[in-house]
Amino acid sequence: VEYSNAGKPVVFLEQDVDYPMGKREDRWWAAYASGGTVYLPLVMVDSGHQISSGSKADFKAAYRTLVDAELTRPPQAQIEAYARQVGTKMRVYARVINAAGQPLSTARNDATLYALIWEDARVGVTGRIVRAAPWTGISPEVASGGEFTATLETANLTSVNWNALHAVVFADYRPGTGSAYDMLQGALAKPAALTADPDSVTVALDANTLEDRGVSVRLVGPYVLSWTAVADVPWVSVTPDSGPISVQPTIEVRSGMLSPGWQHGAVTFTASSEDGLSVAQTIAVSAFSGPRVV
């Protein structure tokens, strides 16, 4: 149930076919789209691009064929996902950029965003059991290149090991006139946090220069965050000094306020959301002022 292909880890997530969660089992049947009897296990890669059922002489070889075919396909979306525990629930923040080359919406092509929450626990056969599968329709319509954001939340999760819980977020849609669905892309959810790139700034300025030095910073985190920046030394400023996570700041070193030699400071970015998420990230700033060396 696990192997690596071209450096890409592959895992299979399991859920009870008699107690399905979310829409995953529905997607299998939509891809099957024929009569007759099927036998367990029902296996699906993507949202139905490749399916299998029943016993196999060599399960690993059969499923490897399904997965290898999927790994050759280019993604049709970009997804950023973050997750955190809120009481006995898991909350997932997702941001999707539509790269499918066509509009996406529930009304147009049943486009849907999901989270699968699984626990590393041997309940069935794989050692990875799905505990929740919240989803939401993509609405209003998202044009090609457009963005969709959503927060998904599970019901109360009891009798689980929170240290063994993980979340994957993906989007799918029905691409044609048939019944089968196609997955646009998936992404593992990261812990809900704020990160900054670069995580430190060092500049050296000619003592006679009158120009300030600016360094662009990329802040990354859940789409719900808004941030504020505070510098702990007067020779550092941040422009802008606050904004939503989509707004990227610049750290400015004020040359006219530097003393000769090295000096050190820091900028702390504090971010929060209306639903109670609060995170922070500090960037160390070092500056040298002195004669130019040639």
Task: Tell me the role of every PLM-derived stretch.
Residues 7-191:
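Short, conserved sequence motifs used for protein processing/export or organelle targeting and
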Residues 215, 259-275, 283:
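A short beta-strand micro-motif common to beta-rich folds, especially ectodomain repeats
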Residues 170-174, 254-256, 270-274:
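Beta-strand-rich extracellular modules
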Residues 193-200, 220-251:
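Surface-exposed binding patches on compact interaction domains or structured appendages
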Residues 1-7:
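Typically the conserved alpha-helix immediately C-terminal to a functionally engaged Cys/Sec
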